[in-house]
Amino acid sequence: MADGFPWLTAIILLPLVASAFIPLLPDKEGKLVRWYALGVGIADFVLMCYTFWHHYDTSSATFQLVEKYDWLPQIGFSWAVSVDGISMPLVLLAGFVTTLSMLAAWQVNLKPRLFYFLMLVLYSAQIGVFVAQDLLLFFIMWELELVPVYLLVSIWGGQKRRYAATKFLLYTAAASIFILIAGLAMALYGDNTTFDIVELGAKNYPLALELLLYAGLLIAFGVKLAIFPLHTWLPDAHGEASAPVSMILAGVLLKMGGYGLIRLNLELLPDAHIYFAPVLATLGVINIIYGGLNSFAQTHMKRRLAYSSVSHMGFVLLGIASFTDVGVSGAMLQMLSHGLIAAVLFFLAGVTYDRTHTMAMDNLGGIGQAMPKVFALFTAGTMASLALPGMSGFVSELKVFIGVTTSDIYSPTFCTVMVFLAAVGVILTPIYLLSMLRQVFYGTGAELSCNINNGAYQNQEDEGTACFGTDCLLPGEAVYRDASVREVFIAVSFLVLIIGVGVYPKIATQLYDVKTVAVNTQVRQSYTQIAQSNPQIYAKGFFTPQIVEPEVMAVSGVIK
């Protein structure tokens, strides 16, 4: 705890406590509540920036801003929160994306009080997941975010919104059981019953137990990260969710899966990671290629972007499995980069939908002439997504490629195959993204059409029209208006960071590199010990049997 003030607790509770006052606001039309929610979001993000600027040391790999209060001491459960190089950048990402998503939902007119209440609760839950140092608290926060997401999709979604929301809830809730089981198993193992992540990392688990725990956690986090074949909830959720909710789904919620893999699977179960790493690498290239091929087959704009996210998350898996400092760093940067890029693309897809009231790309075409600002911003976001040099996506994918190529644990043959297959996915990316640009913005096809009784807008027949942009008009008033000042501001806010990180990656990497090096050192140390005790454990020609002894020791991802 810095200076005796509970900074992280304040960051978590501010949106949650503020949401409780929304029913008391004298606001019938929802105009006051949107300013209130946006103000809370900005205040919390400013509080994050102030806290990390003044009280966080980027040169340290240890947990910082630690707060711990006994909650149920009989079972070792406490309110324990802290941040390190893995969690701190993701906390900032969550605050940035969620605040801008509330600004993106400026025109919501269907139950605005409930909408912004759920957004603020979701804000708190996301932060709680990333800062929880107690594994049971991590699980509670993980479950807490399910409720607002389910309601946000099922109430403000498209025609099949209830199906998509239920599918998301069932997938995530069922998978999260593995987090609870793994947490209980680790907490109850040995003489010391505790859920504290630092203390759990100090325990010496049998290899068989580690493998079981790793497999269970991989399923739980694989669902959230949209790893094939656990990804099928994602296209449905994105296809039916409103643009502001899709921004959070793609920008923050997917990253919870990657964060969980690094925090629990790598840090707490490094021995099991030695056995599962080639599985992660294989799943990574499957995600990259499968997501790219499926994305190209989609005619629904947001479903195409959803499968694009599946493809990009494959690079996170590949980097985590690389056993190299640069590879793990690339995985972290890919999560941050994709969070920004996916959020701006889903937002701009929503802006386009507000004008055309269709996501079917076959029904669009030529709207770039009528909406040049939207066209320019969408093009910039697309260039970032296909990893154009100068954009953040290029740096993150390049680091992952270098990490896999230079890995001294995998054989040259394995590295070559992985890099080649991943490169195929990289080639697919401009194909499906540039074709989307062509279908939507080029040509002369699209006729003015704004029929709320057709397509994805049919869902609002019985509940009124829910708008998420400035130009959501009735059929008789339909026009293609260009982006408003508010919409340009949101998109440019994302693009400035995307280009900034692409031009000078150290802006982001200096926040976490010390920590990722420590985590990778710990994993490589485990590999050395296992390879020395059982050199025949790896298939010949698939791995190299030995690596150089690490120069530093690491315990629970902290350099000793």
UniProtKB/Swiss-Prot annotation:
Which residue windows are transmembrane per the record? Answer: 5-25, 35-55, 86-106, 114-134, 135-155, 168-188, 208-228, 242-262, 273-293, 310-330, 331-351, 374-394, 417-437, 488-508
EC number, UniProt record = 7.1.1.-
The protein's topology relative to the membrane is: Multi-pass membrane protein
GO terms in the biological process aspect are: ATP synthesis coupled electron transport; electron transport coupled proton transport
Tell me, in one coarse class, where this protein mainly resides.
membrane
Give Gene Ontology CC terms. Answer: plasma membrane-derived thylakoid membrane
Keywords recorded for this protein, A-Z = Membrane, NAD, NADP, Plastoquinone, Quinone, Thylakoid, Translocase, Transmembrane, Transmembrane helix
Which GO molecular function, any one, fits this protein according to its record?
ubiquinone binding
Q: Which Pfam families does the record match to this protein?
A: Proton_antipo_M
Reaction(s) catalyzed by this protein?
A: a plastoquinone + NADH + (n+1) H(+)(in) = a plastoquinol + NAD(+) + n H(+)(out); a plastoquinone + NADPH + (n+1) H(+)(in) = a plastoquinol + NADP(+) + n H(+)(out)
Q: Where in the cell is it found?
A: Cellular thylakoid membrane
**Stored NCBIfam families:** NDH_I_M, PRK12561.1
Its biological purpose? NDH-1 shuttles electrons from NAD(P)H, via FMN and iron-sulfur (Fe-S) centers, to quinones in the respiratory chain. The immediate electron acceptor for the enzyme in this species is believed to be plastoquinone. Couples the redox reaction to proton translocation (for every two electrons transferred, four hydrogen ions are translocated across the cytoplasmic membrane), and thus conserves the redox energy in a proton gradient.
What HAMAP family does the annotation carry?
NDH1_NuoM
Q: Which family does it belong to?
A: Belongs to the complex I subunit 4 family.
Protein name in UniProt: NAD(P)H-quinone oxidoreductase chain 4-3
Q: Which organism is it from?
A: Nostoc sp. (strain PCC 7120 / SAG 25.82 / UTEX 2576)
